[in-house]
Amino acid sequence: MNRKSFIQGTVLALGASLAVAATAQTASTAKSKVVLQVSDADPGKWALALNNAKNVQQELGAGKVDIEIVAYGPGIGMLKAEAPTANRITEATQAGIKVVACENTMTVQKLTKADMHAAIGYAPSGVVEIMKRQGEGWAYVRP
């Protein structure tokens, strides 16, 4: 092996090592993201989803994770203004957790935004919202 080949090989190896290190550093400082699906009317499932979201925030730090709970189908009833989960939804949104209702489900169930909790957001389709988030690299959880 001549000296020129040795130097080129060393430079390539060093460059590859730096690229791997930079990727690892970026991955360790990247914000975590999780989307939770709730499509059941069961208050216990809602409590579990809200507990999961809160636990993730406590473990990773609220500023280091984006959390979105997407409700559709029978699960959307727990996002009504007078639902038994209303106080927990308020706490979650105040903690920075995004809670989203499916507008398709609202239309089928003849619900309007006036019927819903004031702090939630909306997506045209709950399933598509989850698909988009997964496509963006979000972790998916269905309690």
Task: Enumerate the language-model features and the residues they cover.
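N-terminal secretory signal peptides and thylakoid transit peptides that target proteins
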Residues: 1-13
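Secreted/extracellular ectodomain signature
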Residues: 8, 22-143
